[in-house]
Structure formats: C-alpha cells, structure tokens
C-alpha cells in the first residue's frame, strides 16, 4: 500500500492566479493599482519625513499618525508588488514558506491598522475632553507603550494563522485564485478540516476589530457629548474639524474591510470571485493611498510644513505652532 508522508501533502509553492475571470484585463487593472501604490509610498514616506524632521509636529497626534503611515507602508507593500508581478510579468509562483510570511505580515498589519485608528480615537478624546491634561496624559513613554502593545497584539493573534495553515494537508492542487496569500483562501485548498481555521479567524476578527470599533464608538460618543456642551459655535466647529481627518481614515479602512470580510465568509455564492479579489486589494490599498491626502488637506500644521519646505524656507526646524 502506498503511504504518503505529511511533507508529500505540503506543496513546494502556490500559483497565484490573480483576479479570477478577468485574466485578460489584468494589465489594465494593474494601472490603478500601481498608481495608488505609488501615491501611498510617496505620501506615507513624506508624512514620516515631515513628522521626524519638523519640531512643530513632535506631538502625540502626529506620533500616532506616524504609526499609521508606517503600518500603511508595510500593509500595502506586503501584497501589491507581488500582485503587479503577476499582472505584468506572469510571475505567479510563491513558495509555501514565502506565502506564510506574506500571510503573517498582511494580517498582522491590517490588525495593527485597526489598532492605531483606535489609539487615534483615544487621542482625539483626550485632546477634546481633557485639553489641559493632554500633554501630561499622552506622554512619549505612554505613546511608545500603547504602540508596542498594539503591535504585539497583532503579532500574537496572527502567528497561529501560520501554524494552523502549515498543519493542513493539501491535496486539492496549489492554484490559488487570488493576488496574495489570504489565510482562508489558502486553507480552502486543503483537503483537511478547516473548521478550526475558520473559527479562529472569526475570533481574531472579533477580538481585534470588535474591540477597536467599541473603543472608537465610545470615544466619539464622549467627544460628541463634550462638543455639544460647548457654548460657542466656533469652538464646536473647531473641535469637530480636528476629528474630520480621523473619521475619513476610519471610513476608508473599515468600509472595504467589512465588505471583504463578510463577502468572503457569507457571500461567496452571491458576489463574483473577481469582485471579492478586487475589493480585497482595495482594502489594502485605499487607506494607505487616502490617509496622507486626507491628513495633508485637513491638517493645517502639515499643510504649512509642506508649503514651507516646497517654498525653500530655511526656518523649518525652528518653526513652532
């Protein structure tokens, strides 16, 4: 009788097929993807440079924005370059271990994106509800600790994805109808029981996004109460304006995330696979692309710094708000 070792059921590599059903148009799809990726790289690197270089931006709000920019850079860079290689050069192979690494980085930093947005909501809550204590509550050590905790939360919750995926037997081929290695997309190629993978994936989603959304909702509920109680219309308008960019970032992040998550689990037979794959990529591209634009347009301090640098002002380091 022929017996198979466990290693015989683990493929050496997967073949990423890109966007299923749209193979003939993938070259055209690559242009908006590439454009968004370039904007994301330039915008987020520019924000990181500004926050590091400008003394005026050495404040808690901008430290959290730097965390968001770094997270966005890693999040989109973990998938989009490979997707462009698939679209342009038909380089579809990805090693099994390389696939697990991509899976780890993608899911870890999407979780961290949500965590940083939650921290930014808490930052706005402290700034509006406790303005006199803002700098004493959100000190540099506190910011470093909560940022590290958010990163470790993602790492510790996502590491089991790689082990659960590696333990599965794969006897349904190695062709993956996707542009990157998503946890459940890879697990569905297995001929084993993926119930544990599905349940754990749902638990992680609830622990990360459920907790973060609850904190964001509570923060903005208290912000709304504080703002409404202000006697001056100008003060209310100014307080709301400080939250506009963050609210836009939340919308850009959570809208495609929820669509991708629920369509993958509950709308598989309703929503075309091509639509799901495109949204899954937009989910990783839209926040990194739009966040620098929104914060650049809505935040006066960042606009002023950019204008002074572009105008060649030599007094950028000494400028204070």
Swiss-Prot record:
Entry membrane topology: Multi-pass membrane protein
Residue ranges of the TM segments: 28-48, 57-77, 102-122, 142-162, 199-219, 240-260, 277-297
Residue pairs linked by disulfide bridges in the UniProt entry: 99-191
One GO cellular component, as annotated: plasma membrane
Subcellular location: Cell membrane
InterPro entries reported for this sequence: GPCR_Rhodpsn, GPCR_Rhodpsn_7TM, Olfact_rcpt, OR51/52/56-like
UniProt keyword terms in alphabetical order: Cell membrane, Disulfide bond, G-protein coupled receptor, Glycoprotein, Membrane, Olfaction, Receptor, Sensory transduction, Transducer, Transmembrane, Transmembrane helix
Extracellular side: 1-27, 78-101, 163-198, 261-276
Residue ranges that the Swiss-Prot or TrEMBL entry lists as coiled coil: none
Main location: membrane
One Pfam short name: 7tm_4
Topology Cytoplasmic: residue spans: 49-56, 123-141, 220-239, 298-321
Any one GO MF annotation of this record: olfactory receptor activity
Glycosylation sites: 5
Stretch forming the signal peptide: none
Family in the record: Belongs to the G-protein coupled receptor 1 family.
Function of the protein: Odorant receptor.
Record protein name field: Olfactory receptor 52N4
Record organism: Homo sapiens
Higher taxonomy: Eukaryota, Metazoa, Chordata, Craniata, Vertebrata
Encoding gene, per UniProt annotation: OR52N4
């Amino acid at each position: 009788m022929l017996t198979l070792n466990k290693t015989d059921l683990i493929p050496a590599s997967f073949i990423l097929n890109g966007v299923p059903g749209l193979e003939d148009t993938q070259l055209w799809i690559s242009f908006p993807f590439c454009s968004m990726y370039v904007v994301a790289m330039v915008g987020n690197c520019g924000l990181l440079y500004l926050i590091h270089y400008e003394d005026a931006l050495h404040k808690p709000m901008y430290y959290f924005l730097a965390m968001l920019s770094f997270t966005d850079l890693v999040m989109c860079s973990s998938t989009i370059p490979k997707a462009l290689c698939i679209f342009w050069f038909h380089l579809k192979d990805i090693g099994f271990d390389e696939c697990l690494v991509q899976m780890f980085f993608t899911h870890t930093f999407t979780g961290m994106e949500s965590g940083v947005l939650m921290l930014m909501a808490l930052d706005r809550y402290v700034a509006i509800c406790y303005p006199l204590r803002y700098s004493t509550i959100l000190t540099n050590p506190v910011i470093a600790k909560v940022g590290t905790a958010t990163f470790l939360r993602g790492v510790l919750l996502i590491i089991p994805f790689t082990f659960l995926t590696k333990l599965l037997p794969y006897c349904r081929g190695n062709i993956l109808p996707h542009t990157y290695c998503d946890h459940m997309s890879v697990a569905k190629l297995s001929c084993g029981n993926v119930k544990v993978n599905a349940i754990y994936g749902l638990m992680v989603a609830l622990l990360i996004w459920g907790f973060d959304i609850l904190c964001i909702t509570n923060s903005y509920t208290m912000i709304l109460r504080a703002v409404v109680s202000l006697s001056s219309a100008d003060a209310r308008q100014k307080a709301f304006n400080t939250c506009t960019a963050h609210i836009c970032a939340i919308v850009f992040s959570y809208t495609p995330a929820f669509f991708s998550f629920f369509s993958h689990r509950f709308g598989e037979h309703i929503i075309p696979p091509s639509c799901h794959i495109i949204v899954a990529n937009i989910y990783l591209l839209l926040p990194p692309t739009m966040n620098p634009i929104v914060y650049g347009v809505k935040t006066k301090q960042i606009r002023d710094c950019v204008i002074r640098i572009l105008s060649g002002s030599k007094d950028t380091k000494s400028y204070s708000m």
